[in-house]
Amino acid sequence: MSVLVRLTSKIASLAKSGRIASARQVFDGMPELDTVAWNTMLTSYSRLGLHQEAIALFTQLRFSDAKPDDYSFTAILSTCASLGNVKFGRKIQSLVIRSGFCASLPVNNSLIDMYGKCSDTLSANKVFRDMCCDSRNEVTWCSLLFAYMNAEQFEAALDVFVEMPKRVAFAWNIMISGHAHCGKLESCLSLFKEMLESEFKPDCYTFSSLMNACSADSSNVVYGRMVHAVMLKNGWSSAVEAKNSVLSFYTKLGSRDDAMRELESIEVLTQVSWNSIIDACMKIGETEKALEVFHLAPEKNIVTWTTMITGYGRNGDGEQALRFFVEMMKSGVDSDHFAYGAVLHACSGLALLGHGKMIHGCLIHCGFQGYAYVGNALVNLYAKCGDIKEADRAFGDIANKDLVSWNTMLFAFGVHGLADQALKLYDNMIASGIKPDNVTFIGLLTTCSHSGLVEEGCMIFESMVKDYRIPLEVDHVTCMIDMFGRGGHLAEAKDLATTYSSLVTDSSNNSSWETLLGACSTHWHTELGREVSKVLKIAEPSEEMSFVLLSNLYCSTGRWKEGEDVRREMVERGMKKTPGCSWIEVGNQVSTFVVGDSSHPRLEELSETLNCLQHEMRNPETFGP
């Protein structure tokens, strides 16, 4: 074996074991480099997600004595696909043509895959149509099929699926998983039925997609259990992918007993299994159990760390999420855009502007600022911290804005009372070809409510129902009631609540009635407030909010006895008002304050300052007549 072959094999072995830095040292120390050695290093970077390193290495390869071949191009196109960088991908395609590899089957398949993952179906289809019919294989067809499914162009995908000269099981899975990703359970089940009637049998990936489709909505619990039963019958219950999807299904539904039973039944634990267990524990609120599993995991990759950071953030422990992010950076694990997005969401929950800006600087250095997931988190962070200019700038930096990007910026403008900017943004969103969803209209209606735009709000509400046929939800009704309530239109607010009473009452979320009761308190309408309170007592007999609002209403109108009676009833029912909580970041340190708490180390100094402020506020000379 020659020295060149031996060293190239060593690079591959080191990279496969995760020792990529050592692999690069061997690569840099080689006396000569052929194309195979370059490809081995390039492929290693691409597979490990080190995309910037892969791009830099490919650039070096272009100007070296060794020239890129079809394996080089497939590796760098895979990097472009993972980054979603269609602009760089087009440059690679131009280089492919100039280098004479435009007839290479692996390269063309990689081009279709790259364009598909970047949602550029026109370019993917052009590459496909430019290929000779005889040169296409199953991978070619499946890559084009995935491109259309990824872009949610279901009719075009179906045309490709029907046109395929020879279907394979993977094509069925692409169709099912694509519909599952969009929550189209009926389509998934219909395709699954057709698959059972064909020559192909479902595998663990098929069942995994079906379980994921059932996980999208709690109303699908019956279908989920049925799919699980079929999975057991077909002998796929022990497969890692299927097992993880079942675990995810039960945790998303909040079925703690079923989730724990699935956890205990896992015998062979892969890296994916460890991550799934941690995720499952976090989703059911078992943060201590998740931490225990984290420490037991033999290997901790970027997904493991990100799952912990995300889990702590969702469970309201943003400080612990930040600590884990710092520990991850110290451990030497290369962070990705998902990790940055997760820790930014944690900063948003705590309104930590200083920490968020430092993390923003780090992710710019790593080249992640253009990712939609990161950009959305940045917009949310700056908006919650009151810096709307930075939020708008972060929105502008997002390369490929998705629906979440537009919705997040829409909410940001709305919360800050910038109704004109919010409505203009909505117009730009429609002009960009982005279809609004239920969340979009919650943001629009909230904006109109906070800005007193009653007429515009009514038009938007009507457009949502008639033009876009979006199913009405409790949150939409609540926004409308809040809008009418803030404007003093209590009669209209009551009519709306009465009209949609079945929707409002049948939901476990009684925010609509609570909003109406709050409006009654604001405008001192005791009679309507008492009427609404009766509805809330029937719907939520153990919920203290309706009692607190009614008591405040009585007290605000000087009816102290009735207010005291309501408070007494709360005591008799064993209810307690949830104490208020606030926090502030000063000098990169977070201080938290809870009503009645006296544990803060600077309590005496803070009390003196508050007393001084209260004295000045009550002094008529402070503000003048």
Curated annotation (Swiss-Prot):
Residues 588-618 are annotated as: Type E(+) motif. PPR repeats lie at residues 3-33, 34-68, 69-103, 104-134, 137-167, 168-202, 203-238, 239-269, 270-300, 301-335, 336-370, 371-401, 402-436, 437-471, 473-503. GO terms for biological process: RNA modification. It is found in: Mitochondrion. Residues 512-587 are annotated as: Type E motif. It comes from the Eukaryota. InterPro entries: E_motif, Pentatricopeptide_rpt, PPR_At4g14850-like_plant, TPR-like_helical_dom_sf. Belongs to the PPR family. PCMP-E subfamily. This is Pentatricopeptide repeat-containing protein At2g36980, mitochondrial. The gene is PCMP-E73.
